[in-house]
Amino acid sequence: MMNIKVSDDQAKTVKHNVGVPMPTTAAHRGLAERLICLHDEIKGDDSLGGLNRIAIALYDESSDILKTFIHSSDGDNPLEHSTAKLSEMPGLKLLARMGGRRTLNDLEKVALAGRDHAIRLVASGYRSSYTVPIQSKGMFYGFLFLNSFETGFFTAPVLHRLRPYAELIAQIVMRELDTVRMMQAAVKVIRQVSTVRDEETGAHLARMARYTRAIALKLAPRYGLNDEFVEYLFQFAPLHDLGKISVPDHILLKPARLTPQEFNIMKGHVARGVEIVDLMVGDMGLQSLPHFPMLRNVIAYHHEAMDGSGYPYGLSGEAIPLEARIAAVADVFDALTSARPYKEPWTNDKAFDLLRSQSGTKFDPDCVAALVDSVATIGDIQARFDETVYD
């Protein structure tokens, strides 16, 4: 077990604040709103007034998925909550591998060739496109897409004017993502150097993160969740049980039911997780960590229950942050359907039945319904991140 020391003053501050969920609504629009402001600034240049859309798509190498992230659009955003396999997009795949830029000054011709993304862009009025891969030091992050309602907009003079803005946007995105990755790497090191041998396998964390994403995408229309919210929840969900590194192995790995005293010790991992992440953010100078309130809320409240019977604060209903309610369903589902030394894995249907039976009491009904409605996605995740293959 790792011994992480927290001063009395630090502990009091954490415990005083953690019982009240941190507001996340405004923070979730952080990078997107900055992009909107920059878009307005760009259009202030008379020669660039026809730039009608800026969008970022991120790449998940482990699943070969290119997914929409943030955008600033004058008209509709036809590609929100979209994903596609990069390997099935030859043009973008080549661009990611070779670098360079791609200019398409007549999207209608591309749409006639049956390209789905081009068809959707044209249907929303866009007529030209300019694509820039976001990459640095051998790492590929995704793409920057620029679009105009005008056919032939991206001329050589326009591209010359746009180049510094494109580089600035790419740098902003990479800096934000690098901050998140730094936190993830630090947590991974903590797990590795501690003596804890918990059940948080790499495959479990990969699956759990993708289940949270699947749930969030289903909930997006009803709750008004943008791609930025979905992406950061995907990034932060695997850190939910960070505090378990402070739980003794004989309790954490016990194959039988815990005694009341042992369960009280186990429950302490929530507060410890918040303490640890607060200290890491402070000590590592990560105060700019994007959407820190979301991360903190996931760690602090994913063991709360809709009827108030959860721990450690006894919150109920919508007092529990949505991100924590989503993470709770994803975490329990993967625990049920995973093999453990003391149990066989449940079938998906059996796990769904249990979640449904506790919908509205333990779990958010919307989150349960969203997961159950993602059967095909769940199957793909389980096949791709099988314990025997991924770990």
Task: Identify the meaning behind each predicted range.
Residues 1-37, 48, 179-189:
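Signal-transmission linkers at sensory-effector interfaces
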Residues 1-4, 41, 101, 137, ...:
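Signal-transmission/dimerization alpha-helices at domain junctions
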Residues 2-6, 141, 147-163, 173-176, ...:
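Regulatory loop-to-helix N-cap segments in sensory/regulatory domains
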Residues 17-23, 27-46, 54-56, 208-215, ...:
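Amphipathic alpha-helical coiled-coil segments that mediate homodimerization
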Residues 40, 52-96, 238, 242, ...:
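GAF sensory/regulatory domain recognition
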Residues 76-122:
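Regulatory sensory and allosteric helical modules in signal-transduction proteins
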Residues 110, 196-391:
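Metal-dependent catalytic cores of enzymes that make or break cyclic nucleotides
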Residues 127-135:
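A short, aliphatic-rich beta-strand micro-motif
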